[in-house]
From Swiss-Prot:
HAMAP family: G6P_isomerase (MF_00473). InterPro entries: G6P_Isomerase, G6P_Isomerase_C, Phosphoglucose_isomerase_CS, SIS_dom_sf, SIS_PGI_1, SIS_PGI_2. Catalyzes the reversible isomerization of glucose-6-phosphate to fructose-6-phosphate. This is Glucose-6-phosphate isomerase. Its EC number is 5.3.1.9. GO terms for cellular component: cytosol. It comes from Bordetella pertussis (strain Tohama I / ATCC BAA-589 / NCTC 13251). It catalyses: alpha-D-glucose 6-phosphate = beta-D-fructose 6-phosphate. The keyword Secreted does not apply. The keyword Isomerase applies. GO terms for molecular function: carbohydrate derivative binding; glucose-6-phosphate isomerase activity; monosaccharide binding. Belongs to the GPI family.
Length: 521
């Protein structure tokens, strides 16, 4: 069992080395991983930090934890089950689950190929939430420049405005409804499925269920819903929702972009799996990103991480990463239930570039807090405007350089004297122009935005988050905070829909709003 961090000599050595390591990019550090280039030059680094990191990983039993992840051990130790998403994308899945995985892959491919041959389903509406939504939504948006076989729309929020907008102008006689829910009890996809089914019925579709597909780990619940066995695609309890893109949850990707695109996405992720599994620590991209993340959060005191993809096609990457990181690492309890003892998961936020520069980069450059930044950009574009792509890359590199280098007072004063003749006013202006610099960042360069490169990028973030969980001694595969809120919502909806019932065990504010909403006509 990993040692509580604050009391361990390995942690104290790591923290001391991180505090005293260079944060000014004195040594170039670029790692190649599964076709990506990851530049960690602007993160804290020294030989002492590398040595301390190796000792910390040994203390936290990292090699054993990683082996459990890939071998189907109880990596999700609070729920006593594997977190075996790596098996889903392996070319040769592990023997215990190979038959099930390959069987579902084959069923999915035959379903898509049959729909293609029949020219069926010009439109697809995917109903999920969280992990069953963000992954396929992000991938179909990111790769649609390669051409769409079908229009795929997504609705996730229980706010029915969302599903109403998604259904607008679709042909009910040529639309496939996908209901994606691991438990098949989740409120949002089932509520939206009811709306979609009524839409089909009201349009005169004779047998609406024939146009509905379920993706779930709870086959019995999908059967009870009325969906035919041939239209139920399965994944398993050992696949976490936020890691489920690699399962049948990838069906909308195959319907929109083709089965070959989905295969390439899986292959890219599998290539990153092999890099993470076999590459030594000092050249291991996900592991180095994790070590930087732990140092930034737990030693250097940064409370958040900004992710800025300089590619408008990656607009949904930020919320995907938000769920991955914050649902995985927003915890405090270690293996024995005691607190981790150091700050853990950061807030994750961001926006695509260059919009981000005109929204929050002022804060990143000159606020007293600041935040580490992940810059993501493609070397090659998929449009013919080469000059403008170079302009995009130049902006990305310039913002990163400014965060790293900063602008000292002497340089700012020279600039100020060029525009302000009064010496006192020039000195005042110079203080406004100072940039502290030394702010950490990572640059991730994709060769181009292909399915393979995107799969590698997503898997790299998954492994980075896993490694941070191991280093902090927390379980990155459960989500008890999410479950607690869902349980409270079930109680509140019963009280809202039964005005005569007693409102019990609610705090004063919640009780006030339940009473007020009951009085609405």
């Amino acid at each position: 069992m990993p040692t509580p961090l604050p009391s361990s000599s390995a942690w104290l050595a790591f923290a001391d080395a991180a505090r005293h390591s260079s944060r000014r990019g004195a040594r170039l550090r670029v790692i190649e991983a599964a076709g990506l280039r990851v530049d960690l030059t602007a993160q804290a680094h020294s030989d002492d930090l590398d040595s301390a990191a190796e000792d910390l990983l040994a203390q936290q039993d990292f090699d054993n934890a990683r082996a459990q992840l890939f071998d189907g051990g109880p990596a999700n130790w609070t729920e006593h089950r594997p977190a075996w998403h790596t098996a889903l994308r392996a070319a040769r899945p592990p023997t215990p689950v190979a038959g099930a995985i390959l069987g579902e892959r084959d069923r999915l491919r035959r379903f898509v190929q049959d729909a293609d041959m029949r020219g069926a389903y010009r439109h697809v509406l995917h109903l999920g939430i969280g992990g069953s939504d963000w992954g396929p939504r992000m991938v179909t948006r990111a790769l649609r420049h390669n051409g769409l076989k079908r229009e795929v729309r997504f609705a996730s929020n229980v706010d029915s405005h969302a599903v109403a907008d998604a259904l607008h102008h679709l042909d009910p006689h040529d639309t496939l409804i996908i209901v994606a829910s691991k438990s098949f009890t989740t409120t949002e996809p089932l509520a939206n499925a009811e709306v979609a089914m009524n839409w089909l019925r009201n349009a005169g579709v004779a047998d609406p269920v024939r146009q509905v597909v379920a993706i779930t780990a709870n086959v019995d619940a999908a059967l009870d819903f009325g969906i035919s066995p041939q239209h139920i695609f399965r994944f398993w309890d050992w696949v976490g929702g936020r890691y489920s893109l690699w399962s049948a949850i990838g069906l909308p990707v195959a319907l929109a972009l083709g089965c070959d695109a989905l295969d390439e996405l899986l292959a890219g992720a599998a290539a990153m799996d092999q890099h993470f599994l076999h590459t030594p620590m000092r050249r291991n991209a996900p592991l180095q990103m994790a070590l930087a993340g732990v140092a930034n959060r737990s030693v250097l005191g940064y409370g958040s991480l900004a992710i800025t993809p300089y590619d408008s096609r990656l607009t949904h990457l930020v919320p995907w990463a938000q769920q991955l990181e914050m649902e995985s690492l927003g915890k405090v309890a270690g293996h024995d239930g005691s607190p981790a003892g150091v700050p853990t998961g950061p807030v994750v936020w961001g926006m695509t570039g260059t919009d981000c520069q005109h929204t929050f980069f002022q804060w990143l450059h000159q606020d007293t807090a600041g935040a580490p930044v992940d810059f993501i950009v493609c070397e090659q574009a998929d449009h013919p405007y080469d000059h403008f792509h170079k302009l995009l890359i130049a902006n990305c590199l310039a913002q990163r350089a400014a965060l790293l280098r900063g602008k000292p007072f002497d340089e700012a004063l020279k600039e100020a004297r060029l525009v302000e003749s009064d010496p006192q006013q020039a000195e005042i202006l110079a203080h406004h122009r100072v940039h502290p610099g030394g702010r950490p960042s990572t640059l991730i360069m994709l060769p181009r935005l292909s399915a393979h490169a995107l799969g590698a990028l997503l898997a790299m973030y998954e492994h980075k988050v896993f490694a941070q969980g191991v280093l902090w001694g927390i379980n990155p595969f459960d989500q008890w905070g999410v479950e607690y809120g869902k349980a409270l919502a079930r109680n509140i909806i019963r009280e809202l829909e039964n005005p005569s019932s007693e409102v019990n065990q609610q705090d004063p504010s919640t009780r006030y709003w339940i009473d007020a909403l009951r009085k609405q006509p």
